Amino acid sequence: MLKEFEIEPLLKDKAPHQTKAIVAMSGGVDSSVAAALLYNLGYEVIGVTLQLYGSDGNARKGACCAGQDIYDAKYVAESVGFPHYILNYEEIFKKEVIEDFANTYMRGETPIPCVRCNQTVKFRDLLQVTKNLGADVLVTGHYVRRLEENGEVKLCRSIDKSKDQSYFLFATTEEQLKLLRFPLGGFYKSDIRKLAKYFGLQISEKPDSQDICFVSESYSKTIAKLAPQSVQKGKIVDIHGKVLGEHSGIVNFTVGQRRGLCIAHNEPLYVIKINTENNEVVVGPINALMQKKILVKELNWLEQPKEGMEVTVKLRSSHAGSSATIYSTDEKNKACVILNDDYFGISPGQACVAYKGEQVIGGGWICS
């Protein structure tokens, strides 16, 4: 059966039995199959799981990197036959991801903690672990492809577009890509389930992790615990500054939101902006949410775009993509993206990821 699931060699100049691979294991089906597949292909596999939160027993069911998932990862490693280590990264994760999540909401923005986690914890620190252990590559179960052409490494969308995770990996650097490998990018999720059963993994039918891993309650309750000031009452105003009502905390709102405003009005109202300086939620009609111009900060380019380059951009993970043009700005490490067509509800704090065909050329964080 393995002949049906051929992958590119992890290293072109080393045979599998000479290649040491660290596999980041979350306890889910994907990373477990990645590890089992490489082991069965003859690679020297070492599984590593990061304990990111939940040592107090409060991990949410269906999350990753905590609680039962850590035991699942260890059990898979033991049943297949390769070593597995658990590293406690709770303090780093709390500072770099959880606190950033709350602070981003406090700035009136909508965060993507999965990108921050990859950027500041999983890739940065696990790559260092990979080097410390004298391994050749770091492998993950992400649905994304890494292609080498003419000595250049490219990050590309997965074959399975319904599972593609390239949006969440836009902050990956060229240096990191040299050591990273994504063996599942050329397969469909259904293939991975088949492989899990073939390898006899007890987690073959385990559901995919859903939502933000460390949020055990609602977003608002989680953030309220981290930043109590986020639930202070304030005014709801229209785009002209007229007071329309009162809100129970900016944490309960995000740009583009319609539900939960509790305001009687002659037309539907949406959240246009969250003004954190005076604790106001600004609302308005749908046309006030339509825009073409986006300012992007903290840029990471895997391929430097030319001035006026035409690309496809994704403005949220579920976005199919919009045609756009990229321009430089006078501000350092910022870019201006002009969409061909108006887009609804562009949210500061989300990522703007640029593609050239299937290739991720980079992106940044939306300012406005």
Swiss-Prot record:
Amino acids binding ATP: 24-31, 50, 141
Statement: the UniProt record of this protein carries the keyword Hydrolase: no
Active site: 117 (nucleophile), 213 (cysteine persulfide intermediate)
Domain of life of the source: Bacteria
Disulfide bonding pattern of the chain: 117-213
EC number: 2.8.1.13
GO biological process, one term: tRNA wobble position uridine thiolation
Spans traversing the lipid bilayer: none
Family affiliation: Belongs to the MnmA/TRMU family.
HAMAP family on file: tRNA_thiouridyl_MnmA (MF_00144)
Protein name per UniProt: tRNA-specific 2-thiouridylase MnmA
Lineage: Bacteria, Pseudomonadati, Pseudomonadota, Alphaproteobacteria, Rickettsiales
Gene: mnmA
